[in-house]
Each structure stands twice: as C-alpha cells, then as structure tokens.
Amino acid sequence: MSWWTTAARTWLTGSLSPFLFTDENEECLDSRVPGALGLYVHVPFCRRICDFCPYCKELYRPQAAEAYAEALIGEIEMVGQRDAGRVPGQRRAVSSVYVGGGSPALQAGRMGEVMRALGRFYEVRDGVGLELHPSDVRPEVLAQLREAGVTRVSIGVQSFSPRLASLLGRPAPDPRRLEAALREGPVPTVSMDLIFALPGQSVQDVIEDMELAMAHGAHHVAVYPFIDFSFTASRVPAAQHRRKREMMDAIAAYCARHGYERDSIWTFARPGGHRYSSMTRDCYLGFGCSAVTLLRDSFKVNTFSVQGYVERVREGRMPSCLTLRFSRRQRMLYYLFWRAYGMVVSEADFRDFFGVELAEAFGPELWAACRLGLLVHEPGAYRLTRRGAFYFHRFESYYTLSYIDKMWGVLRREAFPQELRI
C-alpha cells in the first residue's frame, strides 16, 4: 500500500487505524436502510478464463454449476427468512437486481428459479440486469433470460478490434451478429462494456468502438480504463496516468459533441434512453460466492471458494467470510466514494441517509475540492467537473490497487480467513 493511500485514508477518516475485517458471521441480517435496497447475484462460471479479468470465476463444469445453483437458491432462502428488515409474510421492496460473473448466461436455464426464489422475499421495482459474454448473445439465450425477468443486459465487448481484443486473449465480437441477435430477441436496455488505455490503442480506436456499439444495438456504453491487478495472469502493461487522462478527456469531449449524456464516471447514454448502472446503490444484499453485502453500518463479503460456498450453505450457515464494521465517518466516506461514480452528490440524499448536512460533515473538504476545480456547487448538489472526474478515477485506481487488489488476492488463496487488516 502506498504512503499516498495511507495518508489519504488517515486524513479523510481522521484515524491512523487500518480497516479491520474479521470472520464475524451473523446468522441474521438487518436490511432496514434509508432509501432503496438493491440485490446482487454472482455466477462464477466461464467457458474459458480471461487472463485480465480479476473477478471470482472458474471454468464451467455442469455438475459443479448445478450444485452451485442449488446453493445459491439456498442462500437466498436463508437470507430471506433471517432478514430482520423484512416483515414476516411480506415481501421487502427493492430497487433492482444485478447479476454478474463470470458468465451468468451459462446458467440461463436456472435463472428463472433464482429469480423466483428472490421474488418470494423481495419485490423488485426497477428490473433485472445481467452481464453477458458476447458469445452468449443469441436469440435462444435472450429468450430464456427475458422469461426469467431480465430487462437489462450489459455485454462485455471490450473491443471490436481484432488487434486489441487479442491483447486480452479474446476473439473480437462481430457487431452485426450482436445486432441481429438483439433484434430477434430484444431486451429493453442494452449496454456494452469497452476498455481503453490498452497498449497501442488510440483515441480513434476507442471512438470507433463506441460508434460500432451505438450503431449495433447499444443504448448505453461503459468505457473503462484497463487496470492491471497483481494476482491476474495478464501481461498487458497499464498505461501512464497522463495517457489515461488524455484518452478520458477525448472520450468525454467526443460524447459531449455528439449529444451522448454522461451519467457516471465511465458511462454514456443516448439522450432520453434507459440507463444502466451496477455501481450506484447505497445499500444492497449480495448472493453467491464473492458477493458483497453493504448495509447501514457493515460491509460483508462471501467466500471466493465455490466449493466452500456450497458446503457452508449446505450446512445451513451464512457463507460470508469477512465483515467490516464501519465507523460513522468511514460509512460516510464509502457512501460518497460510490455516489461520486454518478458525478453528482445530492445534499438531500446525504441528509436522509445520515441525518446530518453534507457541508457540516465535510465542509473543509468540499471547500478545497471546489477551489481546486474538482467540484462545482449547484443548488442542492455537488457535481464533479471533468477535472474532478479524472482525479476521482486516479484516486479510485489507487483505492483499487491498494485495497481491493489486496483483499481479493487474499480471498483467492484462503476460503475463510480469520482477519484482514488493510
């Protein structure tokens, strides 16, 4: 962990203490939180393992996948029955469901059962989103997913360029094939994920990918910089920060000129189109291996071991492996960190969540950020500037490599560690 990250944490949290995660495993969860609650479901199986991908995954094996699906439904039943935020006999209203992976469509045939299990305890108000590998964008798969209730898909294109896709060890998707499948099996909202800051990639390369995505079925694109995690097998070097900023500014300028609306740090949408986000939920329950649960005062992560996950659920025990109990200041910072992804922090929303004014909690920090040109204060909200978006990205990169990289690296090696300090 860099001195810069440690200094920033100490200044912002007002404490020299590291973040302490323990093996606390509650048998009851309390989802009583201000505002909407979201749900996340993780499906870890892939046809092949991409070297650059940091997420919890393993090769698809039918028998293991079936056992996992049963355990996933079992965890949903356990949490639903033990959730103190749900009135017995009634369904708890939630905003939306997001299904990530892995390649969740490998279990498309079980997705309806998973959604019905969730539906016994939770009433989904704003639809179901699901990640798709380009090879799974087929009419018959889309039909299964629609039948299960999926209303949004995010397609992991990364790049349509054969040269750039080969750097990631993947074949380049055919945009015409994607468009034909989406036309035959339409989904209300389609997002496509793209990567920038790859070796030899120009701004024009990224713009061409964005244009192909928008011309072949996407309502929305997410354009992420490549991040080199220490525990992956990727040999692709990360770009310098200056190069990332040049590309990010050029992407934002192009989208502004062509009328695409920037609705988060990395995402751009057609005007008036449906939005797709997997990141901007203040509180959510996570199901499946490696899934995170974020509540009013706690952060929990499930084991990264598929076998360990299945065994824990079969024993009737919660599969969480580490829990962080937030201080009030830490929880405020975590809230602001994720709200900043959406480019706007609402003063009313902060007050509703914490019962205190944003300026009262972070007056000096907000003043400094405005003076430095990172934020502008609008009626009722603070908005990130283009400069602020870049420096947020830079801070997020340090956070990712200093905290997430270390945590995920440990959890890939140990199914149920006793403690983690970061």
Model-flagged regions — what are they?
Residues 370-380:
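A short, conserved structural fragment
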Residues 382-389:
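Basic, amphipathic "hinge/linker" alpha-helix immediately C-terminal to the N-terminal HTH DNA-binding motif
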Residues 36, 58-82, 93-356, 414-415, ...:
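C-terminal scaffold of the Radical SAM
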Residues 39-41, 155, 384:
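Short beta-strand motif preference
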Residues 41-57:
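Local cysteine-cluster metal-coordination motifs and their immediate loop/turn environment
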Residues 389-422:
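Short, amphipathic alpha-helical interaction segments positioned at domain boundaries
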Residues 356-370:
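Short amphipathic alpha-helical interaction segments
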Residues 1-37, 47, 85, 90-91, ...:
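Flexible, acidic/Gly-rich N-terminal and inter-domain linker regions that tether
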